[in-house]
Amino acid sequence: IIVDGKNIITEITKAKAKVKSFSESIIIGDYKGFSGKKISDVVNIGIGGSDLGPSMVVESLSHYKTHLNTHFISNVDGDHINEILNKVNPETTLFIVVSKTFTTIETLTNAKSVKNWFLKAANVNDISKHFIAVSSNIEEVIDFGIDPNNIFPMWDWVGGRYSLWSSVGISISLSIGYEKFNQLLEGARKMDSHFRNSEFSDNIPVMMACLSLWYNNFFDYRTHAIIPYSENLKSFSKYLQQASMESNGKQTDRSNNLIEYQTCLLYTSD
């Protein structure tokens, strides 16, 4: 697969290998914090697709949880941050800062707050052992104090709402183990293959898209309720709201012409 003249399969393979190696070193305890203790908690700092997707999967697949406790910070609400930080020990916590540009205001505000909290128990040189990043802005990440070896790629061609299947999913890999994470990737690959290769009459995504347009434009049904029976899937509707409505809820087409029909249903939950 060629994007901008590059074979992205090579880059993807390298990224997967790096996620695998790092995840396994944390899980088995080879990777140590500044005091020599093993990592016990992981805190993902992101917003939008850098938070909704990973947090949904970690919650949904909690039955496969490793010994690591995984937390997510997205809201700039100070009470929310303090609630998470009160649960963790700076000596045994790994922080993942996820931002493609490393300039996202909410994410950087939270990352700086967490960094200040961490430095009350450690020194600046210890940041490299407890903070990693998923980003394309290498310079800004290094300025933050993160070890260049602990920067995971986030490519421009990966949309945020699909990013859980990229290096952004490292929190998933840490939470359930790389092998389970790789099974998730394989499931996504199989669905991609089904969509690309199946006839429209047997193509599940195509049929769902046609039904959505049909009900929206011909029956005037404007909402689609997503109500999971499994409690572990309670956050799935939030993720789907962003994935579907941000992808399909457009006013103009690719040629910037105004669209004269409804392009997306309003997704709701319980």
Task: Provide a role label for each language-model segment.
Residues W117-S269:
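Active-site phosphate/pyrophosphate-binding segments
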Residues G53, V57, I81, V97-K100, ...:
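Extended, hydrophobic alpha-helical segments in both membrane/secreted and soluble proteins
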Residues I2-E11, I39-V43, H67-T70, E91-T103, ...:
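Glycine- and acidic
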Residues G49, V76-D77, K100-T103, S135-E140, ...:
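Acidic, glycine-rich active-site loops and adjacent beta-strand->loop/helix elements
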Residues I1-F34:
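Extended, charge-enriched "interface" segments that sit outside catalytic cores
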Residues S21-I27, S55-S60, L108-L119, Q242-N248:
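Short, well-ordered amphipathic alpha-helices
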Residues D41-E91, I227, N232-L266:
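Anionic-ligand anchoring segments at beta-strand to alpha-helix junctions in alpha/beta enzyme folds, i.e.
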Residues K18-G29, K37, G78-E91:
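N-terminal small/polar loop signature for handling phosphorylated ligands or for N-terminal nucleophile
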